[in-house]
């Protein structure tokens, strides 16, 4: 997660979006504030799992013993893309937007982000999380109404 965090920070710096780091976690929360009443959050997991990647493909993990399984690298890339597009079009927004790059999804580390106040200043009214899945057809999305922040 430490190398992933550094890559996220570098990209956010390149596009010019502000972000907050948290002392007890590798979490990053970027935000676009426009003094709006409502704030929407977008969330993706950034953690690697302690698994050796056995397939010898171009995109294989370069770090032995860890890999971004379950699509975590895709989740991070998608959220970074959302940061870029929404920041470039911030004049069209009618809400503040917070982007949650959450570490330790598999072990419930979202709890530490919440304890450190990531849902405040401005208060977040709703969060949309994302997860890629092989059970979802290409060009489709699946929406569930539930409360989760692992």
Describe each region flagged by the PLM:
Residues 81:
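Active-site signature of alpha/beta-hydrolase-fold catalytic machinery across serine-
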């Amino acid at each position: 997660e430490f190398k992933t965090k550094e890559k996220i920070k570098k990209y956010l710096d390149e596009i010019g979006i502000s972000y907050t780091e948290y002392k007890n976690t590798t979490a990053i929360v970027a935000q676009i504030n426009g003094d709006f009443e409502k704030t929407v959050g977008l969330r993706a997991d950034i953690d690697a799992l302690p698994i050796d990647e056995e397939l010898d493909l171009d995109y294989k993990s370069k770090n032995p013993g860890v890999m971004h399984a379950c699509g975590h690298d895709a989740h991070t890339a998608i959220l970074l893309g959302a940061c870029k597009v929404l920041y470039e079009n911030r004049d069209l927004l009618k809400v503040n937007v917070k982007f949650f790059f959450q570490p330790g999804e598999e072990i419930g580390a979202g709890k530490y982000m919440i304890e450190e106040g990531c849902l405040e200043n401005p208060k977040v009214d709703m969060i949309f999380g994302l997860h890629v899945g092989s059970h979802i057809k290409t060009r489709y999305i699946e929406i569930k109404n539930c409360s989760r922040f692992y």
